[in-house]
Amino acid sequence: MKYSIAFGALAQVASAHYFFDTTIVNGAASRSNEYIRASTRAVAYNPIKFSSNPPADIRDNSMFDKGDGICNQGAFTNAGKTKVLEIAAGEELTVKLGVGAKMEHPGPGLAYMSRAPDDDVVSYDGTGDWFKIYQEGTCGSGDFTKDAWCTWGKDHLSAKIPAGTPSGEYLVRFEHIGVHRSHVNQPEHYVSCVQVKVTNGGNGKPGPLVKFPAAYSDKDPYANFSIYNGAKDFPFPGPEVWDGASSGSSSESEAPAPVSSAATSAPTSAAPSNNGSDIEPAGNTEQEAPSTDGECGVEYVYV
């Protein structure tokens, strides 16, 4: 009984902060961190912030722009302990949150891929080129500070490996960004990387290409975005989603994605409908931003 109570409390806390630790392909779920690199953080569910944020709001000394934005703090040190998941091009890959948590911060879901040099993903630190395969923002006319976001209340993110992806070994980087404090330049990044071997691949040329952590900046529009003054299109960070075709442009610097709230993925993936994402959500008049200091504010305290 004590264990159940403690686990339930942890799940509540982790719905405010969370981490991905399980993969699902064709209905088959993995063990915790079987294919996802575990971080070495003292508290696994804490977010990753920019180094420019107040020191009191940076947890575990983890900073996006200091390398932790690639696959999370210390994740590469666990690469050798992590298996490589075989998945065919065109199949869907799902990552699920640990400890029964759900995403209860407003914000987008995204996924990227990066091919490992010499197709040796276990030895790859993720400092190479990345291309985006999925992003989604808002999905309906709910509360723009909560359930208008496609990811709200979910315990997973899913993305299809584009059919044109060449066979080989890759890191697949999944990310949820909490934007409830972006209005004070404090977006929260929740990042995990899956080690995969793509089979039955195509002859596509992925792109646009970016590098992490340089693909994002604390000066970017998404990092200074307010959800509290009415619904609006969200400026996704990073490049456009690769369409899975035979060509894709390359970039050494950040290639901003179009300003949009619609779900986007390669054609092999069924994108959720964007029901009125540009329309002011019903009953969602302009709201004042929380004045509470600290990482998440009073409205995001769950225990």
Model segments located where?
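Surface-exposed loop/turn positions
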Residues: E91, G168-E169
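A glycine-anchored, Pro-Gly-centered beta-turn/N-cap motif
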Residues: I161, P166-G168
